[in-house]
């Protein structure tokens, strides 16, 4: 099926339509790359501006960045534990900030003003490829965390506390990235769909509270993704006695 | 896509979200009830309880979202469209 039959120019929603870029044998979704590069650029600019001319008493952007740093450190420390959290804080922080900026950037920036030949610009996290990539990164990260910290003793975790747990723990390794990616993808796409359907039914005022709800849930989803990534890493580096 | 496949896909998409919303709905009700009870007993812990509640809400909600993902696949990227 093609795009939904929406008549309003700014409420069009094209699910499953993409702007394809051909690179070698690969077909990539160009609109996702464009938005994510823009948002990554904005994030980098914010950090560069905030860390230039640092002062003892933080003000403005530096203050915001220090608040974020504190927030991410607390998140990582409660999930991973005092010993290992320092190594993983950059990873968790990057995940959190990228997902948060993607979700909000997709909702707050008026992308509809830029017209593409096919597909539409929007949150990079509303594309399943982005979220699967992030989730697989988390899988790699927790395997690496466990193996580098404990060596082959990492596999004790699979038979802890009893060997009966072995099949469940192996299945878990596959369900973790699956649920991580689907949760994020589904939530962000659902927010966009709900707003689009409401705008189609009642174009004025009524969609606004739903948009705020969407902003709220997408912030929570960024927090959940980061928290779960930290929790999985913490589970892998935890010592059993 | 022939009409039987279309009809079956649309019905299945509706059922996927509708049935998938039952369990999380009950779960969220129980969780919210527990949180209200906790706040009533210990009003000073409200901030902490609210944070945990929202986080667990999002987990429950994602179960319905899995149903929604199935529904969206059936509607927009149907593998049986042929």
Curated annotation (Swiss-Prot), chain B:
Broad class of where this protein is predominantly found: membrane
Domain of life of the source: Bacteria
Keyword line: ATP synthesis, CF(0), Hydrogen ion transport, Ion transport, Lipid-binding, Membrane, Thylakoid, Transmembrane, Transmembrane helix, Transport
Swiss-Prot/TrEMBL site (Reversibly protonated during proton transport) positions: 61
SUPFAM superfamilies found in the cross-reference section: F1F0 ATP synthase subunit C
Annotated compartments: Cellular thylakoid membrane
Function, as annotated: F(1)F(0) ATP synthase produces ATP from ADP in the presence of a proton or sodium gradient. F-type ATPases consist of two structural domains, F(1) containing the extramembraneous catalytic core and F(0) containing the membrane proton channel, linked together by a central stalk and a peripheral stalk. During catalysis, ATP synthesis in the catalytic domain of F(1) is coupled via a rotary mechanism of the central stalk subunits to proton translocation.
Quaternary structure (record): F-type ATPases have 2 components, F(1) - the catalytic core - and F(0) - the membrane proton channel. F(1) has five subunits: alpha(3), beta(3), gamma(1), delta(1), epsilon(1). F(0) has four main subunits: a(1), b(1), b'(1) and c(10-14). The alpha and beta chains form an alternating ring which encloses part of the gamma chain. F(1) is attached to F(0) by a central stalk formed by the gamma and epsilon chains, while a peripheral stalk is formed by the delta, b and b' chains.
Protein family membership: Belongs to the ATPase C chain family.
Protein name: ATP synthase subunit c
